Regions:
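Catalytic core of non-heme Fe(II) oxygenases with the double-stranded beta-helix
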Residues: 71-131
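Non-heme Fe(II)/2-oxoglutarate
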Residues: 2-95
Length: 131
């Protein structure tokens, strides 16, 4: 199994500090323009696989109207991003004792007029999402 490292431009200590202090972290220039171009190419070559986005309660068109494609191993370029997120999750586990053992990510496509409204997609009693 290949070793996955966080990009050198990611300052893990700063990410952890920002998350601790503010509840979020912003990683400027997280990936190279070449990698982003590859992601866009992979995404656009799979547009026929996008599905209506849903929330915990199913498809609710007045909350979100975008279309998504969950990242998976067959999407080789974006799967590298998922593997990177697993490495970052390990850092979160060490720093905050979170117990993250699964990472999910998806592409989202917003056609003209589509939206994502503010909502809670992690209802009480079903708190499987940590970050």
């Amino acid at each position: 199994m290949e070793a996955v490292l966080l990009p050198k431009s990611w300052n893990v200590d700063q990410i952890l500090d920002d998350l601790d202090q503010h509840g979020f972290a912003i990683i400027d220039d997280a990936y190279s323009s070449e990698y982003i171009h590859q992601l866009v190419e992979e995404c656009t070559s799979h547009l026929n696989q996008f599905r209506d986005a849903a929330i915990q309660n199913g498809i609710v068109s007045n909350i979100r109207s975008d279309h998504i494609l969950w990242l998976h191993e067959e999407l080789k370029i974006s799967h590298q991003h998922t593997k990177t997120l697993y490495v970052l999750a390990e850092q979160f586990n060490r720093a905050f004792y979170l117990g993250i053992n699964n990472v999910e990510a998806h592409f989202a496509c917003y056609n003209s007029g589509e939206f994502y409204a503010l909502h809670r997609d992690n209802p009480q009693g079903k708190n499987g999402r940590i970050i």
